[in-house]
C-alpha cells in the first residue's frame, strides 16, 4: 500500500539571544538537544538565555527535521524537493517553488529586544535576493509591566529617527503597547518594533530572517555586548507614520469593541478608519469554521499568509481543498487531536490520531483530503496559518523619501553594499542559506 503524507511535527531548534530567558524550557517544556564539535549530544539547560525556538524553518543551515513517523529524519527542504506541490499546494508551489514559504518560531522576550525593522518582498529581492518579512506576534503570556514598541506615537521624519537612534532617545517616539495573553500584533514590513519585560510569543512570518537593527538599548556601546547596527541600510524602508491601531488586537474581543473592529474581507472599506490614510485593512473578523460549531477569528489576512485564532470547543471536520494550501496549527493553550480517516490493508476504515499540545506545531500537507480537529482540553486554542501566493508588492514605501541623510558620508555605500553582502568578514550580514541580516 502506498504511503501517504501525514501531519508532520519537527524537532525544535534553540537560538540563544541576549534578550532570551527560560520560558521556552520551563513553560512550554521544550527539550533542545545540541551537539558539540565531536558529535556529543547534550540537553540545553534552562540556565541559558534561549530567545527563540525554531519550530518549522526552511532556511538553509536552519532546516527543520521531521520528528515522527516514516518520514522522521528528513528535512523540510528534502520533503519539498520530493513532494513539491503535495506539501504546499499547487498555487503556492507555482509562486514559491521549492522554498517553504513560512517560518514558525516561539519567542521568549525576557529582556529588551533591539529596535528593529524588516523589509518587504520588493526591497529584499532587489537588494539581498531574499524574501521580505511580514510577521504576526500572538501573545501566549505577558508579565506585568511588559511592553511592545510598535511604530511611532506620531508622524516623524527619517532625519529625526536617525538622530534619535544615534543619541539614544528613540524610545520617546515609539508607540507603546502593554500586551496581555491572547493579544495579537501584525508587524508589517517597515514597522519599527521592539519589546521588553517577559513576553512569550508565537511568531508566524515569511520564510526570511532578514532584520535591520536600528538601536540596541546601549548594548552597542559595550564591546562585550555590541552587535552590528543597520541604520544606514534601513533608512529608506521605514514607515514613518504614526502606528496604525488596526494592526493590534486585544483578545478576546467582545461586545462593542468586537463590532467596531469587525470587517468583511470582500468590502472595499470598513468602519474602523484604517483606510483614511490609504492603508490596507487588516481588521479582525469572526467567521464560521468548516462544518463544526467552533469560531475562527481571522487575526490577519495579507498577501503572504492568513492566520486565524481557533477556540476549539467542539470537533471540527476540516477539508484542505478549501484552503488550497498546507495548514499549520500552533497550539497556544490546551491540547487537541488531529484525526485522519485512513484505511487498513484489509480495507477497514479507521482514524489515525496525531496529538498536538501547548507549545507544539504541526504541518498538515496540502495533499491530505480531510481530517478532524478534536479538543483534548476544555480550553484549547490553536493558531491556524495558511499561505497565499503574493500577487502585489507591498506599498508602504514612500518613493519621495530620501535614501540618504544630510551631513552623513555615504560615498561608495550604494556600490559597496552589494559587495558587502557577499563578504561576511567585512559586514554585519550573517548567512543562513540566503543573504540576510540576523535579529
Residue ranges and their predicted role:
Residues 288-293, 297-307:
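Edge strands and adjacent loops of beta-rich recognition modules
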Residues 139-161, 296-299, 314-327:
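Short beta-strand/loop turn elements enriched in aromatics
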Residues 174-186, 341-368:
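Short acidic-glycine-tyrosine-enriched beta hairpin
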Residues 165-214:
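Loop-centered beta-sheet repeat module
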Amino acid at each position: 500500500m502506498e504511503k501517504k503524507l501525514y501531519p508532520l511535527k519537527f524537532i525544535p531548534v534553540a537560538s540563544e539571544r541576549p534578550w532570551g530567558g527560560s520560558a521556552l524550557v520551563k513553560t512550554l517544556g521544550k527539550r533542545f538537544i545540541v551537539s558539540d564539535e565531536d558529535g556529543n549530544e547534550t540537553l540545553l539547560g534552562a540556565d541559558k538565555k534561549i530567545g527563540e525556538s525554531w519550530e518549522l524553518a526552511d532556511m538553509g543551515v536552519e532546516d527543520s527535521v521531521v520528528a515522527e513517523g516514516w518520514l522522521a529524519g528528513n528535512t523540510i527542504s528534502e520533503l519539498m524537493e520530493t513532494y513539491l506541490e503535495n506539501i504546499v499546494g499547487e498555487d503556492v508551489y507555482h509562486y514559491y517553488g521549492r522554498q517553504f514559504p513560512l517560518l514558525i518560531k516561539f519567542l521568549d522576550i525576557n529582556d529588551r529586544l533591539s529596535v528593529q525593522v524588516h523589509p518587504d518582498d520588493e526591497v529584499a529581492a532587489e537588494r539581498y535576493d531574499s524574501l521580505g518579512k511580514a510577521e504576526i506576534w500572538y501573545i501566549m503570556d505577558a508579565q506585568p509591566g511588559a511592553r511592545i514598541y510598535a511604530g511611532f506615537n506620531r508622524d516623524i521624519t527619517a532625519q529625526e529617527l536617525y538622530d534619535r537612534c544615534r543619541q539614544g532617545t528613540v524610545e520617546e517616539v515609539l508607540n507603546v503597547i502593554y500586551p496581555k495573553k491572547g493579544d495579537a500584533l501584525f508587524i508589517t514590513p517597515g514597522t519599527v518594533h521592539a519589546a521588553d519585560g517577559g513576553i512569550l510569543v508565537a511568531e508566524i512570518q515569511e520564510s526570511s530572517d532578514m532584520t535591520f537593527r536600528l538601536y540596541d538599548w546601549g548594548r552597542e556601546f559595550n564591546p562585550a555586548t555590541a552587535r552590528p547596527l543597520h541604520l544606514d541600510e534601513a533608512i529608506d524602508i521605514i514607515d514613518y507614520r504614526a502606528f496604525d491601531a488596526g494592526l493590534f488586537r486585544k483578545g478576546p474581543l467582545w461586545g462593542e469593541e468586537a463590532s467596531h473592529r469587525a470587517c468583511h474581507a470582500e468590502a472595499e472599506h470598513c468602519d474602523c478608519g484604517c483606510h483614511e490614510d490609504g492603508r490596507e485593512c487588516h481588521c479582525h473578523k469572526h467567521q464560521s469554521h468548516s462544518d463544526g460549531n467552533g469560531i475562527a477569528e481571522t487575526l490577519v489576512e495579507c498577501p503572504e499568509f492568513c492566520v486565524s485564532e481557533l477556540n476549539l470547543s467542539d470537533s471540527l471536520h476540516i477539508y484542505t481543498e478549501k484552503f488550497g494550501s498546507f495548514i499549520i496549527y500552533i497550539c497556544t493553550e490546551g491540547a487537541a487531536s488531529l484525526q485522519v480517516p485512513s484505511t487498513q490493508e484489509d480495507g477497514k476504515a479507521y482514524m489515525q490520531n496525531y496529538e498536538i499540545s501547548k507549545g507544539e506545531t504541526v504541518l498538515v500537507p496540502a495533499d491530505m483530503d480531510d481530517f478532524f480537529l478534536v479538543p483534548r482540553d476544555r480550553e484549547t486554542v490553536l493558531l491556524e496559518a495558511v499561505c497565499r501566493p503574493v500577487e502585489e508588492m507591498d506599498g508602504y514605501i514612500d518613493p519621495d523619501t530620501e535614501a540618504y541623510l544630510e551631513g552623513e558620508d555615504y560615498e561608495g555605500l550604494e556600490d559597496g553594499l552589494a559587495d558587502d553582502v557577499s563578504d561576511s568578514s567585512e559586514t554585519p550580514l550573517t548567512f543562513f542559506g540566503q543573504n540576510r541580516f540576523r535579529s
